[in-house]
Amino acid sequence: MSASPQSRPTTITCLLGPTASGKTAAALALAARRPIEIVSVDSALVYRDMDIGTAKPTRDERARVPHHLIDIIDPADAYSAAEFRADALRLIGEIAARGRTPLLAGGTMLYYKALTQGLNDLPTADPAVRAELDADAARDGWPALHARLAQVDPATAARLAPNDSQRIQRALEVFLLSGQPMSVLLAAPRRADDEAAAYRFVPVALEPSDRAVLHARIAQRFDAMLDAGFIDEVERLRRREDLHLGLPSMRCVGYRQAWEFLDGDTDYRTMRDKGIFATRQLCKRQITWLRAMPERIVVDCVAPDATALALDTLERVLDDRLPT
């Protein structure tokens, strides 16, 4: 599905949206009518043995249409935006070579940005540096590391909460490895390549006209996860000696809150409330990312006929029937 620099770029349809916005339903509706394969754009779905809390597509759903970039790594390992970009570009070509149509679907906007806009020259993760920062945080607390970050990269520190451990750790890691603030490196021109330039990525964005409706869905879905055995899932992960709350997998929304409950740090109701709140905050960040994409095609994800609207929009993109 690649194209020469002189030819017209191949359109790649992308179904993006916040958590609980109906992406799976829309993708499956399209799969019933088109020979598609779904490439997941979701940083949580890459992990094996994390099914309930990530709302992973069911076995039946995955049997109905091929899914990619799901269950590809162990929770003890990390998966970067650079790895996603390479995998997604490879899969797009492979799916097209089979005579089928790739559909990118998910809500990890950092992955989508890396795919469509290229990568910054940020250093890769270093386990030794991360272990040292984790030890410092265990001794002094993440607010102290946030204060340290403010001294070397005030721009990044200003946009992070003092307990945002994952992002504070990454920003300090980048500074320690490169000697430059992450904010400076992110402001530098991104690296592009001919392979991505062969494609025209068209984002179809599922966004709520009434955020309260989406919030209600989030609460219902979190309760359904709890009823489906989410706590037992986290307990099985927690028994593994190689997993801990410092890992990206265990920082996924819901998992941290359930882990803290199992540690005895919170009661059940507090765990539930914190899990729902964290999911709502994730939803807010996802919508903010989407609204920064002027090229997106918006579908109201809380409309009564949202799935039909999304299906119609996706088919218009695939058939090149969009207004110019």
UniProtKB/Swiss-Prot annotation:
ATP binds at G17, P18, T19, A20, S21, G22, K23, T24. Catalyzes the transfer of a dimethylallyl group onto the adenine at position 37 in tRNAs that read codons beginning with uridine, leading to the formation of N6-(dimethylallyl)adenosine (i(6)A). The record marks T108, R130 as: Interaction with substrate tRNA. This is tRNA dimethylallyltransferase. It catalyses: adenosine(37) in tRNA + dimethylallyl diphosphate = N(6)-dimethylallyladenosine(37) in tRNA + diphosphate. It comes from the Bacteria. GO terms for biological process: tRNA modification. Signal peptide: none annotated. Belongs to the IPP transferase family. Substrate binds at T19, A20, S21, G22, K23, T24. It comes from Burkholderia ambifaria (strain ATCC BAA-244 / DSM 16087 / CCUG 44356 / LMG 19182 / AMMD). Monomer. The lineage of its organism: Bacteria, Pseudomonadati, Pseudomonadota, Betaproteobacteria, Burkholderiales. Its cofactor is Mg(2+).
